[in-house]
Amino acid sequence: NSPGTISLGQGVVSYPPPPQAIEQISQFLAIPDNHKYQPVHGIVPLLDAIATKLKSENGIDINDNQCIVVTAGANMAFMNAVLAITSPGDEIILLTPYYFNHEMAIAMAGCTPVLVPTDENYQICLDKIEQAITDKTRAVVTISPNNPTGAVYPQAALEAVNRLCCDRQLYHINDETYEYFTYNGVQHFSPGAIPDGSDRTILLYSLSKAYGFASWRIGYMVIPQHLFVSVKKIQDTILICPPVISQY
């Protein structure tokens, strides 16, 4: 009702999906096998394309200790992660202000979100994270670029969180949904590029923001290999397989 007003209430981009994606739909529909269930963790061509993207854009070379799982968006990736690494009563650390869906997913899993403040510039306070860790803590969640603040965490800060998680045998969950939304020369860094950190690092990605695929429900996660069986069981139970039409 207010022409020209920009809504900051939800992360909805102003542009549509790429034309070539829309053009592919009719071709997809014409192939009978495309209407059957596909692999729980994603189709091979997309998994290969994601691996290439991670290497060229994020500095992540997928190794034998890691695997990619295609999901129905980053929210599902987070839910998969929480269910795979926790038991009811466990705790997960969220930095404030936090993304509300993360809190809801943690609560749905019967766990407790532990809220840790950031500084006056919405940057990470490592000492406060350390103080919040208990014997029930299972993970620390970072979002960079951040939703809702827009803050981008420097490489050194993310490395410090990742190192802390590795030292304390916690998981570092980094949500990179807004990886392309950086400005004024600020660069996005993925903790997945940290050497020797892959065993405790979980990365979440979404195609909703980068490509305008919000209603297509498509995203992916990078997880340690030892979580693969658990995540596949969770995703098979909830979804069976990610939307096949969106994977093409």
Where do the language-model regions lie?
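N-terminal small-domain helix-loop-helix segment of the aminotransferase-like
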Residues: 1-72
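Active-site phosphate-binding strand-loop segment of PLP-dependent enzymes
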Residues: 120-187
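A short helix-loop-beta submotif of the ANL/AMP-binding
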Residues: 108-114
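Conserved core segment of the aminotransferase class I/II
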Residues: 194-248
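Conserved PLP-anchoring active-site segment centered on the Schiff-base-forming lysine
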Residues: 84-106
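Generic structural signal for small/hydrophobic residues in well-ordered secondary structure
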Residues: 8, 25, 50, 68, ...
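Short acidic capping loops at alpha-helix termini that bridge into adjacent secondary structure
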Residues: 62-68, 88-91, 136, 198-201
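Helix C-cap/helix->beta junction micro-motif
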Residues: 2, 109, 167-168
